[in-house]
Regions:
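N-terminal segments that cap or nucleate solenoid repeat domains
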Residues: 1-25
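Short helix-capping/linker turns of helical repeat alpha-solenoids
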Residues: 9-13, 25-27, 32, 45-49, ...
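Hydrophobic face of amphipathic alpha-helices that form TPR/SEL1-like repeat modules
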Residues: 18-25, 29, 54-61, 65, ...
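Terminal, low-structured helical/coil segments at or just beyond the last alpha-helical repeat
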Residues: 121-158
């Protein structure tokens, strides 16, 4: 445990994520949501997508601190941009409901579409429900954004 903490303090994002998870679940350490939040935050700031997602969930649910939907939106977006499908789904919900942001059904459709690519039946259902509320040009814009996101991320991975 000491080695993991030292590695995290030295800037290792994965070690910080692992510590956040241990403190969140109480696996081998006393459960402590404030500590989990602290370690997830450290990992998130270093770009660890799972730390970003878990931090967003805790911020959304008010675990370890007061609920902060704007910050939750921010971290869901960071994780979603890295391809975390659960973050893409949650971000789409935020855009649909106006949680931590203005309602934006075009953006919601885009994120539901990306999450649906991983086979999420909820994402598929919600994408289709949102599509029914969009005008043809809005749907085309969302589909254009999806294609651009896929292309950008394919280039980034190569």
């Amino acid at each position: 445990m000491h080695d993991l903490m030292m590695t995290a303090v030295q800037g290792d994002a994965d070690a910080a994520y692992q510590l956040g998870y241990l403190y969140e679940t109480g696996d081998g350490v006393p459960q402590d949501e404030k500590e989990a939040l602290r370690w997830y935050s450290m990992g998130a700031q270093k770009g660890h997508s799972k730390a970003q997602f878990n931090l967003a969930v805790m911020l959304e649910e008010g675990r370890g601190q007061v609920t902060d939907l704007r910050k939750a939106f921010f971290w869901y977006e960071k994780a979603a941009q890295q391809g975390e499908s659960n973050a893409q789904y949650n971000l789409a919900l935020f855009c649909t409901l106006g949680k931590g942001c203005e309602v934006d059904l075009v953006l919601a459709h885009m994120w539901f579409s990306l999450a649906a690519r991983k086979g999420s039946s909820d994402a598929i259902h919600n994408r289709d429900a949102v599509a029914k509320q969009l005008k043809a040009e809005q749907l085309a814009l969302s589909q254009q954004w999806v294609a651009q996101w896929i292309e950008k991320n394919a280039v980034a991975k190569s």
